[in-house]
């Protein structure tokens, strides 16, 4: 097995990979293990964190967004340790004003929704050219290589 160069093993992880991992999907678990074992350097950003937390909160409470907003005390009883432990194995990349500017052109050029555009612009800003995702929308982005599972 050939060793990867540093730039080859830098991979951005989309929210759906982390969500599928939390749901027990084997393919996602294998990828997460590679990050844990430091075979690949995994990156996420605040968009991914927000999406994963929102999914996890809805899934564990079995409540809709509106119900949680109406009864925020529901959040007190949640155990979020498993989610934050998952986040801890990744390098968390900050968003900044330049990334926001880049996202504007990415929305237009690749016809992406804002969160996906912010993910792509994060990759572009930090010079990460690989993304791991189950989302086919990223296939439209010519500067990203989709890591197939």
Curated annotation (Swiss-Prot):
It comes from the Archaea. Gene3D superfamilies: 5'-nuclease (3.40.50.1010). GO terms for molecular function: magnesium ion binding; RNA nuclease activity. Residues 11-149 form the PINc domain. SUPFAM superfamilies: PIN domain-like (SSF88723). Mg(2+) binds at residues 14, 116. Keywords: Hydrolase, Magnesium, Metal-binding, Nuclease, Toxin-antitoxin system. Coiled coil: none annotated. InterPro entries: PIN-like_dom_sf, PIN_dom, VapC_family. Its cofactor is Mg(2+). Its EC number is 3.1.-.-. It holds the Pfam family PIN. Toxic component of a type II toxin-antitoxin (TA) system. An RNase. Its cognate antitoxin is VapB2. Belongs to the PINc/VapC protein family. This is Ribonuclease VapC2. The lineage of its organism: Archaea, Methanobacteriati, Methanobacteriota, Methanomada group, Methanococci. The gene is vapC2.
């Amino acid at each position: 097995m050939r060793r990867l160069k540093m730039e080859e093993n830098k991979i951005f992880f989309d929210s759906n990979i982390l969500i599928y991992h939390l749901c027990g999907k084997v393919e996602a678990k294998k990828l997460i293990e590679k990050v844990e074992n430091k075979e690949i350097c995994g990156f996420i950003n605040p968009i991914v964190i927000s999406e994963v937390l929102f999914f996890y909160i809805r899934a564990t409470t079995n409540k809709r967004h509106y119900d949680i907003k109406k009864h925020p005390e529901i959040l007190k009883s949640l155990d979020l340790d498993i989610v934050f432990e998952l986040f801890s194995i990744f390098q968390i990349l900050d968003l900044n004003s330049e990334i926001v500017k880049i996202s504007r052109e990415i929305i237009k050029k690749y016809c992406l929704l804002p969160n996906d555009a912010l993910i792509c612009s994060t990759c572009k800003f930090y010079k990460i050219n690989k993304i791991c995702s189950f989302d086919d929308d990223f296939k439209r982005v010519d500067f990203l290589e989709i890591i197939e599972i």
